[in-house]
Amino acid sequence: MKFKRITALVLAALLLIGLFAGCSKDGSKDTNKPDSNGSLIDQTQRADTSAKYSYLADYLDLTMPVDLQYINSMCAAGTTLYLTAYKQGTEHTYTDPDSGSSWSYYDSELTILSVDPDTGVCAELPNLQLPTVPEDCDGSVDCYSMAGAEDGTLWMLINVYATKFDLPADFDPETDDKWNYPSTDIPGSYLMHIAADGSTLANIDLLAADDSALKEDSMGSNISSFAVDAAGNLYASDYTNVYVLDAEGKLLFKLDGSEYSGSLCQLKADQVGILWYNYVDDTAANAGSDEGGQYFIPVDLETKAWGEKQKMPVNTWTVYPGDDTYDFYYDNNSNIYGYSFATDSKDKLVDWMACDVNTNNMYNTAILSDGRVAGMTQEYTGDTTVYQLIVLHRVDASEIKEKTVLTLACMGLDWNLRSQIVEYNKSNDQYRINVIDYSEYATDDDYNAGVTKLTTEIISGSIPDLFLTSSLPVDKYAAKGVIADLYTFMDQDSTMTRDYFVPQVLKALEKDGKLYELPNGFSVQTAFALSSIAEQYDIWNVAAVQDAMTQLQDGATVFSDGWTKTQVLNNCLSRNLSAFVDWTTGKCSFDSDAFQQLLAFCNSFPDETSSDDAIAYGSADTAVAIDAGEWESDAARIASGKQLMAVTSIYDFSDYIYNTYSLNGKITFTGYPTEDGKSGNSFYINCPLAISSTTKYPDAAWDFVKAMIQKSNEEAEYMYAFPISQAKFDEKLTDAMTEEYQLDENGEQVDWDGDGQPDLVSKGGYEVLGGDPNDYNWQPVYALTQADIDQILALINATTGVYDYDTEILDIVSQEVSAYFAGDKDVKATADMIQSRVNLYVQEQR
């Protein structure tokens, strides 16, 4: 077993002595903790990046039983970790009575493993006696959930799924199939309490035929969650009711839980309830409502009723019991927070990334009673799975070598960028990147609250060093002079000059000759139509589309089935917003004829999809529902004259194959209809980074941006996008045009299909139109042609815009256009109002 240790500097939010239950022996609060009005993650100021405490991360590679199939879940009980695991069970052989061929499989057998977080020693509990499937039944035994106690004992919800077949006396499994006969399901649900060695302390049969089971209070067979409070009371839920039992398993009372569908959880030692999400639709009747979101509905033991519901923070799905410091702890975005109802405030306590831990493969976390935090990762290596336990424990920050910290602001962190930042921080002796994810400030009422907060901080002069610009208003920041021109760095760099990049993408990203963001890859957002139609028009604008529709059959649609007015407007605007807003000059042109024509075009689509169970499509004024079973692909509909255009994203060469080969290459990439007919395509940029114009460390910031782009492009084969590096793009292009043979583990060509010819590697595939719908009509392609490559390059050359989903502007448009779509306002008045509001917004933000 390998044992590795690294040190990591953590945010100041990690500074509670009594971090979790059991951390502070005397139960007193840390005197260093600020008062509730100045929480560790202040609501108006960015968190201090110099930590008072640091965490040491112990990495333990776990040695699992040889017959282990997979790990399902983990929880802490005191200072011990427990895993629900499934190991290889009984082998079953099945023989086809017709062909005589046989095949076998192994079923899974539940077991419970203990893990010592100090050493990583992992072992099955020696005295564990789980419920079993009756001998005359088929079935399985599963552990739905676990709850640990500080004394090291463990509660488990065990469900047994058993099926008994009514087989004839002469049944022969070699020649007959038991599934041809009637069967009876025999469910079982148990709450088991076990000691550290697996010995049974209690085993409560939740479905036992006792005094209550035959009455209306009897439990259902679908027990899905449970909890145990400090007094030993047990709570079980089947999504319909919540049952409360005493420590001996006697039913005390039940509550109707049909209104609050959710999972049971324990907030404090004596407080158990349902974690429930209240879905509120977007209808006008609910406009401005703050009732939506996550709630905790407590069980009141005294009144035997539901207590007063309490609003929870956004994304509260995994909850840990609270203590004297916080009402509860919860996971969000790979961090652990403490929350207080009284102040409606949250403090970030554990930031795995700040500990240089990559959480991409982390699927279980737990909090030990001594305050340590554990996480489990898994990584597939060939035919094996490596499980690693990462345990964080606090040390004095003075013991850690200090580094210069650069902050990176984002609204959600790209999966690959997370991994790259962790590796960068581990390997760089001088600098580290501290990520501030502003999506964590989202509320149920405002998912863009993080953008508002970041913008407010920028206005006040608190500007991060770096930006991940996805979902951020980069044009607005550039207009304010907040972001540096990256050309100034390129032009002084010998290894990453302008020639490094695909030039068409850089050109599209330019604002008045300056470059404010750099991606590691790109795709092309576009639309296509049959060449026989599209090539009749010199300009592909709204008028051309309307005329082209006259060449199709009655009831034909412009785009795919079900596109609505709002959907078309959002898609067209987000791919051509720069045609109506120029952040450099501040000029807006929503009162133009071009925008009014766009609104009129969108108004020709249906208001909404007609049914949840049907697909709606419409012509000029109507919405028609068709049965989902009649669905056809875009290619099939275009070929038969039912549809004019298909919207698509070309992320790599296989996307090109999928979209065009079904129509025998007889397509033209028209893009969305625009007034000039030339700007209907847009680049969607992958993981774009920007540098602050005010950073104290511009060279370090540029080195980081370079490193991230180079790393991504070196591993371009794993990136679902075209690489931004021209050299890497050319490599992928050459690869797409080159036939390759499948090889075995020895590097030898293989003939899996037995046709006598070595098998080729597929570069993509497409639907073959016109065949039997019951047949497999999929055709692989082994290499692109020069004509294919020419069309792809022509598409990239013709793309001049960048996908830009400016939430504030699109919200204004959406609000004002609703009256026009409803027939209550004309198009000119609508365009004038949008022009007035957007113009005011743009001037305020510049």
Stretch-by-stretch model annotation:
Residues 660-743, 752, 797-798:
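Extracytoplasmic/periplasmic substrate-recognition and gating elements
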Residues 683, 747-838:
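C-terminal capping/gating helix-and-loop segments adjacent to ligand/active sites or protein-protein/ligand interfaces
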Residues 60-62, 121-139, 200-220, 257-260, ...:
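Surface-exposed loop and turn segments in beta-propeller and other repeat-based domains
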Residues 578-675, 815, 830:
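Extracytoplasmic ligand-binding clamshell segments of periplasmic binding protein
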Residues 472-526, 540-544, 668-673:
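Hinge/lid segment of periplasmic solute-binding proteins
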Residues 19-22:
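C-terminal motif of bacterial Sec signal peptides marking the signal peptidase cleavage site
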Residues 24-106, 113, 117-120, 146, ...:
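Conserved N-terminal structural module of periplasmic/extracytoplasmic solute-binding proteins
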Residues 116, 197, 201, 510-622, ...:
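Helix-loop-helix "hinge/cap" segment bordering the ligand-binding cleft or interdomain interface
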